[in-house]
Amino acid sequence: KDEHLFFRDGKYLNAKDEKGGKVFWSRGNGWVLGGLAEVLKYLPEEDKKYRPFYEQLLQEMSEKIASLQREDGYWRTNLLNADIYPMPETSGTGLFTYAIMYGINQGILPADKYLPIVRKGWDAMVKAVNTEGKVGWTQMVAQKPGKVVKKDTRAYSVGSLLMIASELYRYLDNNK
């Protein structure tokens, strides 16, 4: 709770990374933040029981996640100790960028603060698209932070790129 991040599961509550830090996995936290956006899509605006809780969680987590974005626009697989695996990673980056853009579009997150984060994330994701149209720098199926190589690709990174694109389109269409 203090970190405004989520452990992958109970096995990681006391786990430590190579530097003795807490283990907060990028893609796992991407599932949470992206999941919050998806939940909010289906909660009615007038819901006073659950909607405020999920909106606040999206706000708090987005603030923390934004602070962890690297200069190149990507997040690393180990969110709090990015230098352990310093290479870019697209599955977490895509989910974070999507959820933050959703939050902007819904008025949950302020555009002036978060659009620069989205721009950097979008640019990073686009740079990861190779000549075959695949999104590289994707951590393979895993359960914790780990090494990533440029050629690694999975459909879930393409999916998050398309989700970001749909939210960017919505934003641009509404702000002509």
Which positions does each model-derived feature cover?
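Amphipathic alpha-helix from the class-I
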Residues: 39-46, 103-107
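Extended, well-ordered alpha-helical scaffold segments
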Residues: 46-65, 110-126
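A short glycine-threonine-serine/GTX helix/turn-capping micro-motif
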Residues: 19-27, 148-152
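Glycine- and aromatic-rich loop/turn segments at beta-sheet edges
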Residues: 1-20, 64-84, 127-147
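CBM-like carbohydrate-recognition segments
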Residues: 75, 87-176
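Long, repeat-rich segments with strong aromatic
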Residues: 43-44, 51-70, 82-94
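Early exported N-terminus immediately downstream of N-terminal targeting peptides
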Residues: 35-40, 62
